[in-house]
Structure formats: C-alpha cells, structure tokens
C-alpha cells in the first residue's frame, strides 16, 4: 500500500543531483514499469527541498535550472495556474500567474476549476493552446504530500505534465503532450497532507475515518504566497533572463 501523495520521491528512491548548504535536489526517473506500479506518469521528477534557513534566491536558481532542463528550448511559454482561487491551499497556481511578468515570451492563463466555471480546465487550456501555439506549457498546482515536513518546502518539477486534482482524489483530464499536442511541464509544492498520514507519522494506526480529511498548516496564507513568489521568479529566470 503506497501513501497518498503527489511526490515521486515519497514512492521511489532518487539520486541526489545537487546539494547546497540549505537545499537538496533529487532526481527520479519513472519508467513504464515504475509508472504502472506506483500509479504515476512516466517521466523525470525533480524535487528541490529547502530547509527553514534557505534563501529564496538559492531556491529560484535551482528551480530555474530544473525548468530549463525539462522544457528544452522554448521561445513562447504558456504558464497555466491551476486550482481554485477561492481556497487558500489550492490557489498556488493562481497566485503565480498574478505575480509573473507576462510579455512576448511568457503568457499566463487561469482556467479556475470546473466547480466554479462549469468548464473543464483541460478544455480551456486546449483552446488557448490552439490559438497562441506555445512551445511549452508550464502547469502550476498545489500538491499533496505524505510527509508533514515537506509542506511548503519541497518543490517538484515533472517533465511529463500533470493530472489536476490527483492529490486529493479529484482526477481531471491530464495535461500532457498526448492530450494537448504540446510539451507540458508541471511545477508545484505540497500544501496539504491527509490526516491519516499525520496519525501514522505519530505512531497511530491507519484510520479509514481520516482518509477523506485533508489538513493544511495554520500559516498556509504565508506559505502559499512565499511559494508563489519563488515559482514566479524561477519561471522568469528560466524563460526570460
């Protein structure tokens, strides 16, 4: 039984690619066999973990490198801010599109969620891609972790797209090359954890009653804003400067 998580590093051991005083970058590649076994998409997963003393600039540089490596050459980038703008723990993508500087190279889109608009995020993104024809789509979303200490501190980049809502069991149509016809890279941060995970971390037994209860930290407003600031700067550094 695997934990409920969006973080590949919590399902398979990776290799440490780079380590600084306050950050650690871990790379994981899931092949077809791994993907089937773990229920995740094939591809490369880059995780940059930061401790409490990490400098934002240090994080930005490491994430920008990961974005450039997974995206390849991109003259036009569509940044898609996924999530519900009315829920703090789910508004990471929306905040990133608010903070990022758009222009000739970077375009931003906030499709919101089906429960708010009545339209699938995929349909909105597909329609915009058909018009502006980006070289790469970068999808930004809040993630779920199976480890409390990674909340707001572990940034994950995936080379093969994202399934919106997967971390909380609300799977939507996947955003990837196969569905959109364009390269899709995702970046996100875990901002929620299941209560059952916390109980198990504290030595308790798995409780089915807790399997649907999702918990966020009390300082979630600060965390989501800081993470959005870091990601928006990393995107600008990767694709503009």
Predicted features along the sequence, with ranges:
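N-terminal amphipathic/basic leader segments beginning at the initiator methionine
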Residues: 1-43
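N-terminal charge/polar-biased segments
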Residues: 1-12, 55, 65, 69, ...
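An N-terminal, well-structured beta->alpha segment
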Residues: 34-71
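Conserved active-site and cofactor/substrate-binding residues in soluble primary-metabolism enzymes
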Residues: 43, 58, 62, 91, ...
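Glycine-rich phosphate/diphosphate-binding loop of Rossmann-like nucleotide-binding domains
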Residues: 80, 84-108
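Short glycine/serine/threonine-rich phosphate/pyrophosphate-binding segments
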Residues: 87-91, 119, 146
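A structural signal for small-residue-enriched, beta-sheet-centric alpha/beta enzyme cores
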Residues: 109-110, 139-241
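Catalytic-core regions of hydrolytic enzymes
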Residues: 109-137, 142-143
């Amino acid at each position: 039984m695997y934990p409920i998580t969006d973080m590949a590093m919590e399902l398979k051991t990776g290799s440490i690619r780079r380590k600084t005083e306050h950050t650690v970058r871990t790379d994981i590649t899931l092949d077809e066999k791994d993907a089937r076994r773990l229920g995740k998409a094939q591809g490369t997963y880059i995780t940059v973990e930061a401790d409490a003393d990490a400098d934002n600039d240090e994080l930005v540089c490491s994430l920008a490198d990961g974005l450039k490596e997974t995206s390849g050459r991109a003259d036009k980038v569509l940044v898609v801010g996924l999530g519900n703008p009315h829920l703090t723990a789910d508004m990471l993508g929306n905040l990133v599109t608010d903070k990022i500087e758009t222009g000739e190279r970077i375009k931003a889109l906030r499709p919101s969620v089906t429960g708010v608009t009545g339209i699938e995020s995929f349909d909105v993104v597909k329609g915009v891609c058909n018009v502006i024809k980006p070289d790469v789509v970068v999808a930004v979303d809040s993630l779920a972790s199976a480890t409390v200490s990674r909340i707001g501190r572990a940034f994950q980049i995936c080379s093969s797209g994202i399934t919106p809502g997967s971390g909380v069991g609300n799977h939507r149509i996947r955003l990837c090359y196969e569905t959109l016809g364009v390269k899709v890279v995702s970046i996100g941060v875990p901002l929620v954890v299941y209560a059952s995970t916390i109980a198990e971390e504290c030595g308790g037994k798995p409780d089915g009653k807790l399997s649907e209860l999702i918990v966020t930290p009390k300082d979630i407003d600060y965390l989501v804003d800081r993470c959005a600031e870091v990601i928006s700067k990393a995107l600008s550094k990767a694709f503009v400067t």
